[in-house]
Every structure is written in C-alpha cells, then in structure tokens.
Amino acid sequence: MLLRIANVFSREETARIRVALEQAAWQDGRVTAGYQSAKAKHNLQLAEDDPLAREIAEAMLQRLWQHPQFMSAALPSKVFPPLFNCYTAGGEFGYHIDNAVRQVRNSAERVRTDLSATLFFSDPDEYDGGDLVIQDTYGTQRVKFAAGDMVLYPSTSLHKVEPVTRGARLASFFWIQSLVREDAQRTLLYEMDQAIQQLTADVPDHPSLVQLTGTYHNLLRRWVEV
C-alpha cells in the first residue's frame, strides 16, 4: 500500500523548517547507505547528531504519533529517527531496496524496516526532476508531493529518486517497524479501520459497528507482533 499522509506540517511550519534546512551543514549522503546503495546514491545529508536534525525529527515524531491516518496505516512499533537529505545540481539516488534492518546510532536498538517514509519540505515547483519513483504491485508510481505532505510505502519496494536538474529538493526520510509486518495484512486492517471510522460518523448507533470493530481487533490480535 502506497499512501499519502497530507499536512503533517502546515505551510507556515514547513516554510520555517525549509529556511533552517537551507542554512544547515550538509555532508555526503553516502555515509548512511549500504554497500550496494552507496554506488547509486548522490545527494547531501545532515549528520545524524546534527542539532537541527534532532530538533526537526523530534517535532516530526510528536506530530506523527498524533496523526490518526499514520497510526492507522503504519501501526508503528518502532520508528527509526528521521534523517534529512538534499538533492540538487544533478543529485539522484538510483534504483535500490532499503536495508532490512537499521541500527539506531549509539544504541543497541535495531529497527526492522517494514515501511519507508519521505516527508517533503520543498514544493514541486521549487525544483525540476527529483521524483520519487516506486515500483509496486500496481506498476510504477511517481511521487512528488507538496511541502508538508508525506508518502508511506512498503520497504520491500524497489525505488529511486530521479536527478534534480533545477533548485533543491529538501526532505526527511525514515523507516517504521510495524506491529504487523506483512503489507497485505496492514492494508486490510487500514481499509477496515477507515470504514469503521466513516460508519461511526455516518451511523454512530448502528449495532453492526460493534461486531465490525470486534472483527478488526480479532484480526489485529491474530497478526500483531509485540
């Protein structure tokens, strides 16, 4: 399931973050890539211990843990601390699949990468190229969302970032370990949860809502890993 999570940050918040990122100390992005991925990666990145990166990452996680759509779709167990990248002057990242497990810096904690996420801080009209191209079961998907919006997709997906030929593409990227590791199961649970929420708004007293909600939780209980 590929999903757009809209308005994680408002336009005003995104503009302030973008100004701060434009003045940040960027470094070679290959430092966080695996052996194979490093061959295809040509971008800039903030150091994981950069104070600005940590500040924005903390704000992102606070916002996401309160975002109903994200919580419903991702069913997060662990979230790898968000990283930040910049593509400019021909920067690109060729086709690759994200590493299955990520080690949190200066920690024994490991995160299984069930879901990948990119939160955009540049609007599409601010740069040319830079499309996130994702190959999934429905074919090739091209993603270039508004600043403040986020894309969520399975980490098993082959994907790339096309060369940026004008301007700069600023974004955050990170990974989620879900309580439910299989994408098909997460998708079914998400669709059922969305239907329950809509029915609750439309016919809040319908007796079938209790049964449907019970079925959701019984499926979650069957598939969840805690």
UniProtKB/Swiss-Prot annotation:
Binds 1 Fe(2+) ion per subunit. The keyword tRNA processing does not apply. Residues 78-178 form the Fe2OG dioxygenase domain. Fe cation binds at residues 96, 98, 159. Its EC number is 1.14.11.-. GO terms for molecular function: 2-oxoglutarate-dependent dioxygenase activity; iron ion binding; L-ascorbic acid binding. The keyword Metal-binding applies. Keywords: Dioxygenase, Iron, Metal-binding, Oxidoreductase, Vitamin C. 2-oxoglutarate binds at residue 169. Its cofactor is Fe(2+); L-ascorbate. One of its GO terms (biological process) is intracellular iron ion homeostasis. It is an enzyme of class 1 (oxidoreductase). It comes from the Bacteria. Pfam families: 2OG-FeII_Oxy_3, PKHD_C. HAMAP family: Hydroxyl_YbiX. This is PKHD-type hydroxylase PST_0995. It comes from Stutzerimonas stutzeri (strain A1501).
